Amino acid sequence: MSKSGNGNGDKVLYCSFCGKSQHEVKKLIAGPSVFVCDECVELCNDIIREETHETHEETEARLPTPKEISNFLDEYVIGQQHAKKVLSVAVYNHYKRLQHKSEDGVELGKSNILLIGPTGSGKTLLAQTLARILNVPFAMADATTLTEAGYVGEDVENIIQKLLQKCDYDVDKAQQGIVYIDEIDKISRKSDNPSITRDVSGEGVQQALLKLIEGTVASVPPQGGRKHPQQEFLQVDTSNILFICGGAFAGLDKVIRERSDKSSIGFSAQLKSKKSSNDEASKVLGQLESDDLIKYGLIPEFVGRLPVVTTLQELDEAALIDILTRPKNALTKQFQSLFKMEGSELEFRDEALIAIAKKALERKMGARGLRSILENILLDTMYDLPSLEGVNKIVIDESVVNGLSKPILIYEQDEKKSASGSKD
């Protein structure tokens, strides 16, 4: 749209949408027989952004089913099928409880989770992967660093601060997050009898965690912490935060055996004891009861706040080999991607994978030991490779894993020679 101006042949242009002249706006963009001003462009952008945000929120609101959660866990975590099933159902019920507030007056309790399993069995990875599929903030804490308020160490409220940091201090998001507390077995009290002296890193921490896990309004310093004391503390309601606690609980199988042995008396008790002593620890853990955890050193109130308990099996050689190769972000795939950036292909032979798994089993580190083994094997190659030219492939075999030889480097000219030789 245009209009004659001052009679000198100048034309005043107008926005085809809002009708404002070129003098009333900052910018007028021309199209085929139409004009649009910068204000209308900004308005259109706002409308599109708002609609996109609403669509995104609708997508996020859809809660995956337990089977979908378990299938997603399968992509990243090898084995532990029973633990995956228990976690999938518990997490689904927890977030379903948040989405559908009870209309019949029945209050649904929160089902926090306790994961029991040896080091490197996948406890932390399961919790991290759950947070990823649900697209909620996730924070990790180490129970061994926690102390009662007023003592040297981390207060339990610091856990909530970590969760807030993960979501840019959005309180609403944090209140629906997941917190994983590792090494929870390390805060077991030192004896069955309540101690007269303060146990600030054991029973004291359990007492401090009680309300936080059950649900309370925690006061957390805002962004910047104590540097700005005049700022008001953020109030975070923890009643909808899902707490997952994990620990190795070394020796718990002995506690279970002792209880089961006492269930019989006389000659039959001795027979049962002999039989149970030959059982694998993982099978014994399947008979776990709440009293066993209390006997181990967790206070009854704390055990009561963790109603969902599941055990993870110790990983065998086959599972460790699968962990090296099968998941989306498998360790071998990560290193292959790293070497690809240098223009080289990294190949692990089957016997090398078996040798790596055996080393991890010897170290009793489970899946956690795999990365350090691979780092040691590939250290020299990663050091030299950026300085070398024409290396097409690096091959890792059993002798390399056992330190008897160096990785096999295949150069570009070697491949060309072998290719021409095969033609002849």
Curated annotation (Swiss-Prot):
The lineage of its organism: Bacteria, Pseudomonadati, Pseudomonadota, Gammaproteobacteria, Legionellales. One of its GO terms (molecular function) is unfolded protein binding. One of its GO terms (cellular component) is HslUV protease complex. Pfam families: AAA_2, ClpB_D2-small, zf-C4_ClpX. PANTHER family: ATP-DEPENDENT CLP PROTEASE ATP-BINDING SUBUNIT CLPX-LIKE, MITOCHONDRIAL (PTHR48102:SF7), ATP-DEPENDENT CLP PROTEASE ATP-BINDING SUBUNIT CLPX-LIKE, MITOCHONDRIAL-RELATED (PTHR48102). Keywords: ATP-binding, Chaperone, Metal-binding, Nucleotide-binding, Zinc. ATP binds at residues 118-125. Component of the ClpX-ClpP complex. Forms a hexameric ring that, in the presence of ATP, binds to fourteen ClpP subunits assembled into a disk-like structure with a central cavity, resembling the structure of eukaryotic proteasomes. Zn(2+) binds at residues 15, 18, 37, 40. PROSITE patterns: CLPX_ZB. Residues 1-56 form the ClpX-type ZB domain. NCBIfam families: clpX, PRK05342.1. This is ATP-dependent Clp protease ATP-binding subunit ClpX. CDD domains: RecA-like_ClpX. The keyword Membrane does not apply. One of its GO terms (biological process) is proteolysis involved in protein catabolic process. ATP-dependent specificity component of the Clp protease. It directs the protease to specific substrates. Can perform chaperone functions in the absence of ClpP. It comes from the Bacteria. Belongs to the ClpX chaperone family.
